[in-house]
Amino acid sequence: MAAKDVQFGNEVRQKMVNGVNILANAVRVTLGPKGRNVVLDRAFGGPHITKDGVSVAKEIELKDKFENMGAQMVKEVASKTNDVAGDGTTTATVLAQSIVAEGMKYVTAGMNPTDLKRGIDKAVAALVDELKNIAKPCDTSKEIAQVGSISANSDEQVGAIIAEAMEKVGKEGVITVEDGKSLENELDVVEGMQFDRGYLSPYFINDAEKQIAGLDNPFVLLFDKKISNIRDLLPVLEQVAKASRPLLIIAEDVEGEALATLVVNNIRGILKTVAVKAPGFGDRRKAMLQDIAILTGGVVISEEVGLSLEKATLDDLGQAKRIEIGKENTTIIDGFGDAAQIEARVAEIRQQIETATSDYGKEKLQERVAKLAGGVAVIKVGAATEVEMKEKKDRVEDALHATRAAVEEGVVAGGGVALLRARAALENLHTGNADQEAGVQIVLRAVESPLRQIVAKAGGEPSVVVNKVLEGKGNYGYKAGSGEYGDMIEMGVLDPAKVTRSALQHAASIAGLMLTTDCMIAEIPERKPAMPDMGGMGGMGGMM
């Protein structure tokens, strides 16, 4: 086991604070409408330019072990805020730096760090309650667009495209961000349920121009095993042929004689059918087949529930208004499923999301909810160069997270104003002793720090602006983008309440732990001896 370097007291705390300041100063330059970019070196490819706080924080590793511990703890603030709210990482870092800086003054003066932390925790709890009280719902497309614009560095086009996407697929719909092919941002919306499986044979295509197989008013047969024998399918095919309607077969696979017969029938015009593989694998495949069954009003024909293919009837089949099958995707539009059953299925999947442990599992469950509840929208980010594309994608993703948070918990006045107004909750806060009261004072001063940083980056005088904003009431604040004062919500400067709340809670949590630290332990790196000189190698004539 390697030897350890153990350090105590003010000296090591100062090193930790140095680490906090190095990371926070790198992150804070990105805050506000006039915040600057940070350029990140990459081992492969060109540099990455970003205004995303958490991306900057994740890049920072310091040489000094004790300074690095301080930096990593603040990095945790940014990461946690990003995980919970998806935005507000720079605000969280600025708040953490301020609480640590103010708190260290009191610790150095001899106050009890544990009581200081208790005071900080009480103040933050009161502020969070007040933020919830002053938050207003974010319902309209205009408000959603404003939240998106602010988060995307005052880019109104980004806000507008996110608002349009939410309007089209609903607030539960899946919105993804991808690289575009042009210079402009584009929005692609897939109505209905789409899954990533296409036709099993190109002979099923009936729209040569679009290269798709389109089925109007079709039946949908769902089977959880392979189909290779046409005899198993004949009873169902005969019933569908009598009804004079097309048929989509979704099964684990359709192969051999069964696939050949379906193709021949399709070409001859006897029965319009298309076969596709079921989406997903294993248990996820079963779950997705069940989703499709509920959406189309059919059942999954499975031996597990005592149903067989030979005995299937038209009542077991799902139905839809239209289904389009491409080479790689199938889209079901207007399934005939019962609305109450679809809602119940969505509620069931939402419960699974709450108990899911992996991010991948959660993401897949959320996709299933979206496909049942609304649809899927793809925002294609356009840019002239790859470096600009990455930077724009970062901003669009931040804006998307911010708008989701706004819809969830409402919005408050932006530009650091909400935190200043929430200070009113601390006026009547009773603490146990003078040290806890000092903890409350630390938070009172810290909540000014986001506004101070925004003003400083805009070239203003922070103290003058903070005092003028404090003289006002309600949503009165300073719009740094234009340098004017007024009602922040009317001027379209909104922050999601969830983002502001998460930033404050995570900043106070880590900062409080730092203040109560009195000892730090780091590994002493072993000095390995240099490799011996190779000298002249045999037969090489002494090349050294």
Curated annotation (Swiss-Prot):
Keyword hit for NADP: no
Subcellular location: Cytoplasm
GO molecular function: ATP binding; ATP-dependent protein folding chaperone; isomerase activity; unfolded protein binding
Catalytic activity entry: ATP + H2O + a folded polypeptide = ADP + phosphate + an unfolded polypeptide
Alphabetical UniProt keywords: ATP-binding, Chaperone, Cytoplasm, Isomerase, Nucleotide-binding
Gene Ontology BP term (one): protein refolding
Binding site for ATP: T30, L31, G32, P33, K51, D87, G88, T89, T90, T91, G415, D495
Main location: cytoplasm
EC numbers on record: 5.6.1.7
Cross-referenced Pfam families: Cpn60_TCP1
Enzyme class, UniProt record, top EC level: isomerase
GO cellular component entries: cytoplasm
Alphabetical list of InterPro entries matching this protein: Chaperonin_Cpn60_CS, Cpn60/GroEL, Cpn60/GroEL/TCP-1, GroEL-like_apical_dom_sf, GROEL-like_equatorial_sf, TCP-1-like_intermed_sf
Family: Belongs to the chaperonin (HSP60) family.
Quaternary structure annotation from Swiss-Prot or TrEMBL: Forms a cylinder of 14 subunits composed of two heptameric rings stacked back-to-back. Interacts with the co-chaperonin GroES.
Biological role stated in the UniProt entry: Together with its co-chaperonin GroES, plays an essential role in assisting protein folding. The GroEL-GroES system forms a nano-cage that allows encapsulation of the non-native substrate proteins and provides a physical environment optimized to promote and accelerate protein folding.
PANTHER family given in the database record: 60 KDA HEAT SHOCK PROTEIN, MITOCHONDRIAL
Name of the protein in its database record: Chaperonin GroEL
